[in-house]
Curated annotation (Swiss-Prot):
Keyword set, alphabetical order: Signal
Lineage of the species this protein comes from: Bacteria, Pseudomonadati, Pseudomonadota, Gammaproteobacteria, Pasteurellales
Keyword check for Signal: yes
Annotated signal sequence range: 1-23
The protein's name: Uncharacterized protein HI_0449
Length: 178
């Protein structure tokens, strides 16, 4: 009977430890904690050039493709996970699996976000060898998220928005000046 008590106490402790860390699990696993925003940087922490480039590219890519049923949070989680280095699967493998179909909409949105973030990063690296080093990846993720949310509401900033124009020009200047 003493052995049974020891095993019961150990089992109860493990269950309790598992439950107490559940919130940390939901922060990492996509699609959990649906009411939580993906990223919400303070305005003073946002790098304008990074945010603007990501916002503008996202609007240009997804305008007319995002409706009220699109899983915007999942898309942004995928992009954010890419920038945080959480995606360990090769991009080619993600592309192959994504394009073969058969995925739920939320999973498709997540991996579309990963591919979008990777494409933005690759394009910046093509612009100049050290361009990616001049951006803030979390500001990029915030720009992607805000653009997708705005597209979903039908309220995306226009191509003449002063903040976006100034930020994009600043990034172009930073990446092309020697």
């Amino acid at each position: 009977m003493t052995m049974f008590k020891k095993i019961s106490v150990l089992f109860f402790t493990l269950i309790l430890a598992g439950c107490s860390s559940w919130s940390s699990v939901t922060n990492y696993i996509p699609f959990m904690g649906n009411d939580k925003k993906v990223i919400d940087l303070d305005k003073d922490k946002i790098d304008q050039k990074s945010y603007a480039a990501a916002y503008e590219a996202t609007v240009a890519t997804y305008k007319g493709r995002v409706n009220e049923n699109f899983f915007v949070d999942n898309f942004a989680s995928g992009a954010n996970d890419w920038y945080l280095g959480r995606i360990l699967v090769p991009v080619k493998q993600i592309q192959d699996k994504l394009y073969t179909g058969g995925h739920d909409s939320d999973v498709y949105a997540y991996y579309s976000g990963v591919l979008h973030a990777e494409a933005l990063q690759a394009n910046l690296k093509r612009l100049s060898a050290n361009c990616w080093e001049k951006v803030d990846s979390q500001s990029m993720a915030q720009g992607i998220y805000d653009a997708m949310r705005d597209l979903q509401k039908g309220e995306a900033r226009g191509e003449n928005d002063e903040y976006i124009v100034q930020g994009s020009e600043a990034l172009l200047k930073a990446c092309t000046s020697k």
